[in-house]
C-alpha cells in the first residue's frame, strides 16, 4: 500500500473519482467481451461459400439483390470463402460460444467473491482474447469441429465477466448511483456490438480477409487487459491511490465496500426459494431469447435476406445497438431521477423498465417479420426494438445488486448462466428451420421466435 502522501499525489492525476474510472474500464471490459463474441456472426457470412446452394435453389419470394455480389446475374464467389458449411452447421458454430459461457458462470461468481473481481474478470477476458487471435489458424487447420471447440473455450473465458463485474460494482457503487453506473458499464455491450459490427464490415469490405477481424479484436482484448491490470482493483480499500475523501464516502455508503470480514457461505437454499429471484430469472430468459436472436442472426438477415453488401451490413447491424446504448442511458437517468424524487420505489422502477424492455422489442420484431423486402421498414423496426430493449439495463440487469449486494456475483452467475440457454438454442434452431440458403423464410422464423418469447 502506498503512503498517504503518494496516494494523494497520484489521486490528483485523475480528473474523476476512482469509481468512475472503474466504471469506464468496466464499460470497456464489456465492450471488449462483446466484440470478441459477435465478430464471428459477421465474419461467417464471408467465410462460407454459399454460391452453390444459391444457384441450385430458386426462391421466388427472395428479395431483389442489387448489391455488389452480383456479377452477370449470378452470385460471385467470395474471395476468402473457403468453407462449405450448411445452415445447421453454421447455427451450431454460432451457438457454441454459449455452451462454454454457461458453464463458467457459477465458478466465476464464486472466484470473484472469494478472490476479488479484478483478476477473475481480467484473466478470463485475456484468455478469450488469445483464443480470438488463434481463430483463423485453428479453423483453417481443423474446420468446423475445431472452431466449435475453440468457441466453447472462448465462452468459458467470458463466463465470469458479468458475475465478476457485479461483485466489483457492488463493492464500489453507492445504491443511488447504480442505475447510471449499470447503464454505463453494461451499455458497453452495445458499444461492443456497434464497434464489432462496424469494424468487422470495414475490415472485410472489398476483398478484405475475414481473418483480419479476429486479429484486430484479439489485440484489442490484450490491450484492455494491460490497462485493467494497472488501473482497477477489486475493492476501494485495496486501491493504492484512491483519495481519502472518496474512500471514506464509499465505506459509509456501500455496505459491501469492506471485505475484510469473513463472509457467510452463499445461501443457495434461500436464493432458490426466493420469488423475486425466480421473477428475475424468467425476465432474463425472455430478454436473452430475443437478444441472442438479434445478435447472432441479424448479420445473416441483412446479408442473405435484405441483400446488403458486407460493408452496409456492418453499418446497419450496428445501428440498432447504437439506439439501445443511447436509450440505456436515458432509461437509467429517468429511473434514478424518479427514485431520488420518490415518484416511485426502486422495485417499481425495475418492474416498469423490465416490462418496457421485454414487450416493446417483441412487438417490433413481429412487425419486422411482416415488412418483407422493405429495407427501410425492417431496419427501422430493428432499431426501435433495440432502443426499447435499453430499459433492460436499468431494470432487471442491476436488480441483483438490490436483492443481494453481498452475493451479487453468485446471483448474477445463476441468472446469467441459466438464461444463456437461449443463446444455445436460438442460433441452432434458426439454422434447422432454414436449411436452404434462401433465408427469406428467416423473416417468419424471427417473428415466431418473438411470439414465443412474448408468450
Residue positions per predicted region:
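Conserved MFS/SLC helix-loop-helix module at the cytosolic interface between two early adjacent transmembrane helices
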Residues: 103-145
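Extracytoplasmic gate region of multi-pass secondary transporters
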Residues: 37-41, 269-329, 389-397, 401, ...
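Flexible cytoplasmic loops linking transmembrane helices in multi-pass membrane transporters
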Residues: 4-17, 68-85, 240-293, 342-358
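Central mid-sequence intracellular linker of multi-pass
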Residues: 178-180, 187, 204-273, 279, ...
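Glycine-rich segments within core transmembrane alpha-helices of 12-TM secondary carriers
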Residues: 161, 177-208, 212-224, 320-329, ...
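Cytosolic juxtamembrane N-terminal segment immediately preceding the first transmembrane helix
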Residues: 1-87
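C-terminal ends and interior cores of transmembrane alpha-helices
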Residues: 126-141, 355-373
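Cytoplasmic helix-loop-helix junction between adjacent transmembrane helices
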Residues: 147-190
Amino acid at each position: 500500500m502506498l503512503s498517504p502522501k503518494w496516494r494523494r499525489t497520484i489521486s490528483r492525476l485523475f480528473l474523476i473519482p476512482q469509481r468512475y474510472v472503474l466504471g469506464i474500464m468496466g464499460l470497456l471490459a464489456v465492450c471488449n467481451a462483446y466484440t470478441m463474441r459477435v465478430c464471428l456472426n459477421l465474419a461467417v457470412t464471408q467465410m462460407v461459400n454459399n454460391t452453390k446452394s444459391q444457384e441450385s435453389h430458386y426462391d421466388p419470394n427472395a428479395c431483389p439483390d442489387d448489391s455488389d455480389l452480383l456479377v452477370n446475374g449470378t452470385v460471385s464467389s467470395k474471395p476468402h470463402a473457403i468453407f462449405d458449411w450448411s445452415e445447421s452447421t453454421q447455427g451450431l458454430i454460432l451457438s457454441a460460444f454459449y455452451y462454454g459461457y454457461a458453464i463458467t458462470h457459477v465458478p466465476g461468481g464464486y472466484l470473484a467473491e472469494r478472490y476479488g473481481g479484478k483478476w477473475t474478470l481480467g484473466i478470463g477476458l485475456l484468455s478469450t482474447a488469445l483464443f480470438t487471435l488463434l481463430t483463423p489458424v485453428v479453423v483453417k487447420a481443423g474446420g468446423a469441429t475445431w472452431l466449435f471447440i475453440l468457441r466453447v473455450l472462448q465462452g468459458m473465458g467470458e463466463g465470469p465477466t458479468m458475475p465478476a463485474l457485479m461483485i466489483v460494482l457492488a463493492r464500489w457503487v453507492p445504491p443511488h448511483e447504480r442505475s447510471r453506473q449499470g447503464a454505463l458499464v453494461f451499455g458497453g455491450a452495445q458499444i461492443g456490438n456497434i464497434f464489432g459490427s462496424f469494424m468487422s464490415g470495414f475490415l472485410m469490405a472489398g476483398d478484405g480477409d475475414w481473418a483480419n477481424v479476429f486479429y484486430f479484436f484479439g489485440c484489442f482484448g490484450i490491450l484492455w487487459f494491460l490497462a485493467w491490470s494497472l488501473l482497477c482493483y477489486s475493492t476501494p480499500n485495496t486501491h493504492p491511490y484512491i483519495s481519502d475523501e472518496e474512500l471514506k464516502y464509499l465505506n459509509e455508503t456501500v455496505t459491501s465496500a469492506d471485505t475484510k470480514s469473513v463472509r457467510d457461505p452463499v445461501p443457495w437454499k434461500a436464493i432458490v426459494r426466493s420469488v423475486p429471484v425466480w421473477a428475475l430469472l424468467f425476465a432474463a430468459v425472455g430478454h436473452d431469447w430475443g437478444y441472442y436472436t438479434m445478435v447472432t442472426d441479424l448479420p445473416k438477415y441483412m446479408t442473405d435476406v435484405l441483400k446488403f453488401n458486407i460493408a452496409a451490413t456492418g453499418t446497419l447491424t450496428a445501428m440498432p445497438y447504437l439506439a439501445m446504448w443511447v436509450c440505456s442511458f436515458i432509461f437509467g437517468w429517468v429511473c434514478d431521477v424518479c427514485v431520488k424524487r420518490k415518484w416511485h420505489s426502486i422495485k417499481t422502477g425495475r418492474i416498469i423498465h423490465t416490462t418496457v424492455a421485454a414487450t416493446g422489442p417483441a412487438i417490433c420484431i413481429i412487425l419486422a417479420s411482416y415488412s418483407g423486402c422493405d429495407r427501410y421498414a425492417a431496419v427501422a423496426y430493428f432499431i426501435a426494438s433495440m432502443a426499447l430493449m435499453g430499459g433492460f439495463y436499468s431494470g432487471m440487469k442491476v436488480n441483483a445488486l438490490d436483492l443481494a449486494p453481498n452475493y451479487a456475483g453468485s446471483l448474477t452467475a445463476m441468472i446469467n448462466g441459466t438464461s444463456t440457454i437461449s443463446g444455445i438454442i436460438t442460433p441452432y434452431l434458426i439454422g434447422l428451420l432454414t436449411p436452404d440458403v434462401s433465408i427469406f423464410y428467416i423473416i417468419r422464423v424471427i417473428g415466431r421466435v418473438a411470439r414465443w418469447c412474448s408468450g
